Amino acid sequence: VALAAYLPELGITHLDLSENKIGMTGAKVLANSTGFASVVCLDLRDNPILKSGRAALAASPYKTALNVINLGGERVDKAEAKELRKAFGNGVKVMIRA
């Protein structure tokens, strides 16, 4: 996550950070990084991101290229699942565990 700003320079569009202990803070850092703008597919399954981390990703102004985000592994209630899908938009496949 510390190298998120360099993702475009490295040509990284598919980022698999599953099972990497990326927490709420890491999710917020990624969400606020300009490098997030180049990510098309983001796999964050099985990380303790928590609700505020998921909300930060959904609210990120840099999620413009995103097509798929995997937030599976944490329980997400139906109301939050609906909010996340709405925040990410119709063009993004949001994978969660409800």
Where are these regions (language model features)?
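Short, solvent-exposed loop/turn at the beta-strand->alpha-helix junction
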Residues: V1, K21-K28, P48-A55, R75-K82
